[in-house]
Amino acid sequence: MLQPKRTKFRKVQKGRNRGLAHRGSKVSFGEYGLKATGRGRITARQIEAGRRAITRHVKRGGKIWIRVFPDKPITEKPLEVRMGKGKGSVEYWVAQIQPGKVLYEIEGVSEELAREAFDLAAQKFPVSTTFVKRTVM
């Protein structure tokens, strides 16, 4: 599971997920990419589930890049605990996703196979996605 090795602070405030992704919005490593068109947060488990779906579908062929990293800790209080008494403990890590962010990239496989693999991975996410190709400038 992806998570930071060390952080400056153990817990963070909730914050707001606004705006569009400008960094990481282009396919820069592979030939094809899976780009988010919706906004939300993706957990480390969902990122791993998507990676597994892609890897299994392409039968371990080609090269895959994961372009998102879960760097925000999410805290939860245990069940049946009253409010107050401080912030809960860190339960899982998420990556905040803005529209336009490229989530995965792949090369070394056909476009049809890449589309099928990314469709399988997209089913694991709570955000809407689209298939994109690398544009040569």
From Swiss-Prot:
GO BP field: translation
Taxonomy, superkingdom: Bacteria
Keywords in alphabetical order: Ribonucleoprotein, Ribosomal protein, RNA-binding, rRNA-binding, tRNA-binding
GO cellular component: cytosolic large ribosomal subunit
Stored PROSITE patterns: RIBOSOMAL_L16_1 (PS00586), RIBOSOMAL_L16_2 (PS00701)
Region (Disordered): 1-22
GO molecular function: rRNA binding; structural constituent of ribosome; tRNA binding
Pfam family name, one: Ribosomal_L16
Disulfide bonds: none
Family, as annotated: Belongs to the universal ribosomal protein uL16 family.
Subunit structure: Part of the 50S ribosomal subunit.
Function: Binds 23S rRNA and is also seen to make contacts with the A and possibly P site tRNAs.
HAMAP family listed in its UniProt record: Ribosomal_uL16
Protein name: Large ribosomal subunit protein uL16
Provenance organism: Chromohalobacter salexigens (strain ATCC BAA-138 / DSM 3043 / CIP 106854 / NCIMB 13768 / 1H11)
